[in-house]
Design a protein with these regions (language model features):
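Glycine-rich phosphate/pyrophosphate-binding loop and the adjoining helix
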Residues: 187-240
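Helix-loop-strand module that forms the ligand-binding subsite of alpha/beta enzymes
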Residues: 108-195
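N-terminal beta1-alpha1-beta2 submodule of the flavodoxin-like/Rossmannoid cofactor-binding fold
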Residues: 36-133, 138-146, 229-240
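Acidic, Ala/Val/Gly-enriched low-complexity intrinsically disordered segments
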Residues: 3, 11, 19, 32-37
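Hydrophobic/aromatic beta-strand patches that form the interior of the parallel beta-sheet core
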Residues: 44, 78-80, 176-178, 211-213
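A short, flexible beta-alpha/helix-coil linker loop
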Residues: 49-51, 181-185, 217-220
Length: 240
């Protein structure tokens, strides 16, 4: 049988499937066909501020989630609160496991890397990731840094090609950064936060579609957050 195109192959497979289905009642066979709706989005919400509902970064990240929910078919929203469940600090034993090739993991490895493996799966399943963080001393929160240290791993979030170049494994994801700072950005103030997160996600995970939103001046007298104004140019991942 000569098949000249993919369309012909698909047509033949469908015909064979329909013939098989017709004979299923005679053979007392039942078939369940599951169709995945790829328009449904999974969202991962990372909260890293210790200020709970008083947090402006959490308020901004939640506003982003609301915008996404309005313009997308949401399948699932997973919330990873790094204050309620603090990521474990890397120690000598866990670092040794991090540097193992994934094919060398044993039962003890999986136990020691249980948190790391869990958050890797959360990121892997997410179509969109919303990360909320305050700016502390020009940088990200300690809990977010610890989460990143647990997440990033050779052989898991990135691999190497034959030339030794890193290849990120999570390229088709959209990330929104929701950043809150007590002061305001000026030309003289360095950005060690958004730039750092973008570089880490690009280099060690292959994620290049990263958009940062800032709520600034939160310590000023009479400050009131206007998240709609901050998000006035917001576009969801299926619109950008």
């Amino acid at each position: 049988l000569l098949v000249r195109s993919n369309h012909q192959r698909i047509a033949i497979k469908l015909k064979l499937l329909f013939v098989f289905i017709q004979f299923c009642p005679l053979l007392n066979i039942s078939i369940v066909i599951t169709v995945k709706d790829y328009s449904m989005k999974n969202i991962l919400h990372i909260i890293s501020s210790p200020r709970a509902d008083q947090s402006y970064s959490k308020g901004l990240s939640s506003a982003i989630i609301d915008r996404l929910s309005q313009s997308n078919n949401i399948h699932k929203i997973v919330v990873r609160d790094l204050i309620k469940e603090v990521p474990p600090l890397a120690d000598e034993v866990s670092i040794h496991e991090f540097y193992k090739h994934p094919g060398m993991y044993d039962e003890r490895s999986n136990q020691l890397l249980s948190y790391a493996n869990m958050i890797v799966e959360e990121v892997k399943e997410a179509d969109v990731i919303v990360i909320g963080t305050p700016m502390y001393n020009f940088g990200i929160s300690a809990s977010l840094k610890t989460w990143l240290d647990q997440l990033i791993r050779a052989g898991i979030t990135y691999t190497f090609d034959e030339q030794g170049n890193r290849i990120g494994q999570f390229k088709n994801k959209k990330v929104y950064l929701a950043i809150a700072s007590g002061g305001r950005k000026t030309e003289g103030n360095p950005d060690y936060l958004a730039a750092y997160l973008k570089d880490v996600l690009k280099t060690y995970a292959g994620i290049t579609n990263v958009k940062a939103y800032w709520v600034e001046g939160t310590v000023e007298n009479g400050f009131k957050a206007n998240y709609d104004q901050v998000l006035n140019d917001f576009t969801s991942d299926n619109e950008s």
